[in-house]
Amino acid sequence: ITDSLGNFAIGVPPGFYLVKWEKYGYIPFEMGNYALSTDTTLQNVTLLPGFVQDVCGNVSGVWPSGSVYHVLCNITVPQGDTLTIENGVTVKFVAGTGMVCNGTLNVLGNDSSKVLFTSKEPTPLPGDWDNVELYGFMNNINHLIYEYATDGFTGSNAIGSTFDNVYMVGNLSL
């Protein structure tokens, strides 16, 4: 319950908390291991319209711009299929999960709206999720931020694949 300005107050004992803002029809925002003490004022948060899609198993098709995907188990792009991830998409991997691409992966980020592959953990650490394995032909990876994985891209036979402006951040190894 909020006041007329949308503010509210709640009493909690001092400690470390997962703080999460959610509203139906909007992408949630989380802060993990956030220290709350007496009279803590939290930052203002603006939730962006959109939905979070949980994925697991075989995937293909188009993941539209600005959406968020939670990878709950290993995902696979089957041979002969294509997964196209448009600019501004965030893909959050649960611990120990990853992607195997036997088909084609197109990551279509751009200068102003990159694609993000990251950990789903509220306080991410290197090695939180596995990696992306490429075995299909003609993958196209553009303007991707790839963070907190165990490894960078692995695989073989990814003939004709291109990588342009891929930023590896906070991974255990390349």
Placement of each model-derived feature along the sequence:
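Surface-exposed loop/edge segments in extracytoplasmic proteins
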Residues: 1, 27-32
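Short, acidic Ser/Thr/Gly-rich low-complexity loop/linker segments typical of extracellular
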Residues: 1-11
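Beta-strand/loop edge motif enriched in small/polar residues
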Residues: 4, 48-174
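Short strand-edge motifs at loop-to-beta-strand transitions and within beta-strands
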Residues: 8-10, 29, 41-43
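Hydrophobic loop/turn residues within beta-sheet-rich immunoglobulin-like superfamily modules
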Residues: 11-15, 34
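A short, solvent-exposed beta-strand micro-motif common in secreted/extracellular proteins
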Residues: 14-25
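Beta-strand-rich interaction surfaces with strong enrichment in secreted/lumenal proteins
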Residues: 31-35, 72-75
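Extracellular beta-sheet/turn segments enriched in Thr/Pro/Gly and aliphatic residues
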Residues: 33-52
